[in-house]
A protein has these predicted regions:
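Metallo-beta-lactamase
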Residues: 1-94
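C-terminal regulatory/interaction regions
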Residues: 90-232
């Protein structure tokens, strides 16, 4: 909801566009929430532009002042979200899987906005799942309750936890911390008290923070929590 005060061209928007302005929206929060649809969001941003506001009073932080500044921010925000929406749909229609799209879709420099709240990659995934649902069309296993980590655990037992842990450590050292986490989690499924695997979890999450995971406060909070959890 927008409360508009025409005498001063002021819009009171609370957290309508998120707590950080102008940052990419969180179309689905890490804390758990219903998916937020792109089209109503874009309509809201355009409505604010049409009002030609001079002051925005958000739900957090100080008021934002200046008609030219506000319109420029809103224009860029609208363009950024619209771009990600269109690029995601184009990728879906081309048969590209969601994880590839999450990796490949980036904002052009002229549409760059902050990602301290929502992230482009998360927006891509939410848009994909809003249209397609939870079935990613990649594997029959998606239709059943068995988790991928269970299969990874079987492979860890087959090759041995020490060999698997060496590979995970190598992945951390070669800047592939996400893959290292996958393997370390499988090891810990087989041997919950495996100290080297726990150390890999700490190192991998530290690496993710260093690689930009500290930009989004949602992501940095989760990564730091995991570091504390696995520090033994």
């Amino acid at each position: 909801m927008i409360v508009f005060l025409p005498q001063s061209q002021t819009a009171i928007i609370s957290n309508l566009l998120g707590p950080l302005f102008p940052h990419f929206p969180n179309l689905n929060t890490l804390r758990g929430d219903r998916y937020r649809f792109v089209e109503p969001y874009l309509e809201t941003v355009q409505k604010l532009r049409d009002l030609q506001v001079h002051v925005i009073i958000p739900g957090r932080h100080l008021p934002i002042q200046g008609a030219e500044l506000i319109d420029g921010c809103l224009a860029r925000l609208h363009g950024a979200v619209d771009y990600v929406h269109r690029e995601t749909l184009a990728g879906m229609n081309a048969g590209i899987d969601v994880h590839t799209l999450m990796n490949d879709i980036v904002l052009p420099s002229e549409l760059r906005v902050g990602q301290g709240y929502g992230k482009v990659a998360w927006g891509v995934r939410t848009i994909w799942e809003t249209y397609m649902g939870w079935f990613h069309l990649q594997s029959s296993t998606e239709l059943y309750a068995a988790q991928p980590i269970e299969a990874m655990g079987e492979l860890v037992q087959l090759i041995g936890v020490d060999v698997a842990c060496e590979r995970a450590e190598s992945l951390v050292s070669t800047d592939q911390p996400v893959l290292a986490v996958h393997i370390a989690e499988a090891i810990l499924l087989v041997e919950p008290n495996h100290e080297r695997a726990a150390a890999v979890m700490v190192a991998a999450h530290q690496a993710l923070l260093a690689q930009g995971g500290d930009v989004s406060f949602w992501e940095s909070g989760w990564l730091r929590h995991q570091i504390i959890k696995w520090s033994r």
